Amino acid sequence: MLEQPYLDLAQKVLDEGHFKPDRTHTGTYSIFGHQMRFDLSKGFPLLTTKKVPFGLIKSELLWFLRGDTNIRFLLQHKNHIWDEWAFEKWVASPDYHGPDMTDFGHRSQKDPEFAASYREQMAKFDERILTDESFAAKYGDLGLVYGSQWRAWHTSRGDTIDQLGDVIEQIKTHPYSRRLIVSAWNPEDVPTMALPPCHTLFQFYVNDGKLSLQLYQRSADIFLGVPFNIASYALLTHLVAHECGLQVGDFIHTFGDAHLYVNHLDQIKEQLTRTPRQAPTLVLNPDKHDIFDFDMQDIKLLNYDPYPAIKAPVAV
């Protein structure tokens, strides 16, 4: 089945992973250096051994493609993946006068009373982002995140580079180039970024009328993050191939530190007891050609029949 490389990775980390402390103080079992390969001609690699919310993957990727860095677009599509990073800026500002939200990530997981207050303040924040344009402009923007790095990389000359737009043009005009690369890792920006990019660099490859993509991911949360990453970059491969008039080839996923958090071990073991089902099929709007013009309704998934979702805490 198409998702077997993911299940093999999870089992390998359970069997061979080294225990490491980490930034979140949760603890992980990790391996360093691993590669998975998915033949996209055989289906779309959205996991079936647990339900993965494809709508969130679509809206996040469209957000990146637009070069958008403000969570307002995500909230308009009921996507809360990036809320905490903007909320952190808001509660640390002199304009915030609500209850103390210091270290809200850890406290909300350990203190039920605080968690209720946190949810209330986050709901108020989200609503204000959606309804107050000036507030959204000030506190909804995350700055140098993927959309900015892909579509408007800031140079030392003071201008910007549309890396992804340039690479798509290169695929059309020089498909066999070995420079079809987009990078999100800028050492100058890393100290001030909302979250230094986990998926740091990707490269396209054209052969025999097929487009393949390889992603290098420096840090990978196997249970919660990697299923999203697989589907997101598979979708990106499909979209770029669609615009360039190519078929899809492989998505190759290369990892640096691939890890399972200690508080995800029971969940991944449950997932590994499930037999994978047939992969779904991706359908793109044939009347749209420029990937930067795609909307949510232009991307559809057919025959997705997953097992139920498995909940797990996010390490913060």
From Swiss-Prot:
InterPro entries registered for this protein in UniProt: Thymidate_synth/dCMP_Mease (IPR045097), Thymidate_synth/dCMP_Mease_dom (IPR023451), Thymidate_synth/dCMP_Mease_sf (IPR036926), Thymidylate_synthase (IPR000398), Thymidylate_synthase_AS (IPR020940)
Keywords tagged on the record: Cytoplasm, Methyltransferase, Nucleotide biosynthesis, Transferase
One GO term (biological process): dTMP biosynthetic process
GO cellular component, one term: cytosol
EC number: 2.1.1.45
Subcellular location: Cytoplasm
GO MF annotations in UniProt: thymidylate synthase activity
Role played: Catalyzes the reductive methylation of 2'-deoxyuridine-5'-monophosphate (dUMP) to 2'-deoxythymidine-5'-monophosphate (dTMP) while utilizing 5,10-methylenetetrahydrofolate (mTHF) as the methyl donor and reductant in the reaction, yielding dihydrofolate (DHF) as a by-product. This enzymatic reaction provides an intracellular de novo source of dTMP, an essential precursor for DNA biosynthesis.
Protein name per the record: Thymidylate synthase
Organismal lineage: Bacteria, Bacillati, Bacillota, Bacilli, Lactobacillales
Gene from which the chain derives: thyA
